[in-house]
Amino acid sequence: MKKTALYHWHEQAGARIIDFGGYLMPVQYSGIIAEHRAVRSAAGLFDVSHMGNFYVTGERSEAFLQYMVTNDLSKVRDGEAQYNLMLYPNGGVVDDLIIYRLDSKTFFLIVNASNTEKDYAWLQQHIGAFDGVCLEDHTDRLSLIALQGPVAIDIVKTVFPSVDFDALLQFQFCRTLYGDAPVMIARTGYTGEKGVEICLPNEAALPLWEALYDAGRACGISPVGLGARDTLRLEMGYSLYGHEIDQDINPLEARLKWAVKMDKGSFIGREACQQVELHLTRGVAGFSIESRVLPRQHCKVYNTDRQEIGWVCSGTLSPTLQEPIGTCNIVRKYITSGDSVFVDVRGTLHKGEIRRLPFVKTSLG
């Protein structure tokens, strides 16, 4: 089992540790609800070093990635990042990822922890058609720290005073130094709040983590585990691989059409997406439940005539709204905000309501 460079800090902080994606990771510290609320009201510090990361370099690196992903990388300038998906030829999702453009020949990819080996193999399988392009896995060399919340930018400013964070917009990044260590700081995140994600060599991770934590103490900063990371993303309706998206779900079903650019030229899965677009019958929607039960993945969803129309993708008790919420993959004609549905939780049907996503408003608006 792998450990991140911050593992011993988590252990000393009393975190509950679990196996996630082959890493020993903190699932919670003080508790999921308290950590969630800290991010929504102040700031949270996340160790997400288990995420996979690759460098793609070479003269034809952009052409290679344009073929591998759904979004249009030609629209991305140096110092910008873009949300993307890799698809199988049938339109199912290999993974979702963020691509950072350092320059025209250098791209940095962050992928889901559970898919790192699969993604590397998928990219490597197709790279041969693009002469001179090189793929390198740096997952074991680099740490990734996320600082998220309404006061996150105020905190990071004190640790990196030379960086003009006011000029750094969402999905932009800069490169600087922390001591002698090269650092990449991106205005990205998985919570819906203002914040940054910071990538740096493993040996510099602990000093930076402690500096950010100390700088945020007066603001109410909290370390945050994977448990609250999931409730935060679910309140925003963000997709998680293996839940809202997977190898059998087309991104058009999953509310991700905005990240699929049919007119950019050829990419793997394009023809399948075009066919799905013509005959789109299902979609992912948000829902809430009236009773205090927790809807879980694979619970069946029914219409008011008690006909099965789909299944739950993700579910939780929203710490912000204090009610059970979730996402479901259902027949499209039932995706109307305010419509009633029924969710089967442990053999009992519970009345719910289709909800507009995201469930909450945040510091990003």
UniProtKB/Swiss-Prot annotation:
What's in the GO CC field? cytosol; glycine cleavage complex
What keywords would UniProt list here? Aminotransferase, Transferase
- Which biological process, per GO, is one annotated for this protein? glycine decarboxylation via glycine cleavage system
Q: Which reaction does it catalyse?
A: N(6)-[(R)-S(8)-aminomethyldihydrolipoyl]-L-lysyl-[protein] + (6S)-5,6,7,8-tetrahydrofolate = N(6)-[(R)-dihydrolipoyl]-L-lysyl-[protein] + (6R)-5,10-methylene-5,6,7,8-tetrahydrofolate + NH4(+)
Gene Ontology molecular function, alphabetical: aminomethyltransferase activity; transaminase activity
The record's section on Pfam families has: GCV_T, GCV_T_C
Catalytic EC class: transferase
EC identifiers of the protein:
2.1.2.10
- State the InterPro entries in the record: GCS_T, GCS_T_bac, GCST_C, GCV_T_N, GcvT/YgfZ/DmdA, GcvT/YgfZ_C, TrmE/GcvT_dom1
Functional description taken from the UniProt entry = The glycine cleavage system catalyzes the degradation of glycine.
Q: Which family does it belong to?
A: Belongs to the GcvT family.
Quaternary structure per UniProt? The glycine cleavage system is composed of four proteins: P, T, L and H.
Name assigned to this protein:
Aminomethyltransferase
Q: Which organism is it from?
A: Chlorobium phaeobacteroides (strain DSM 266 / SMG 266 / 2430)
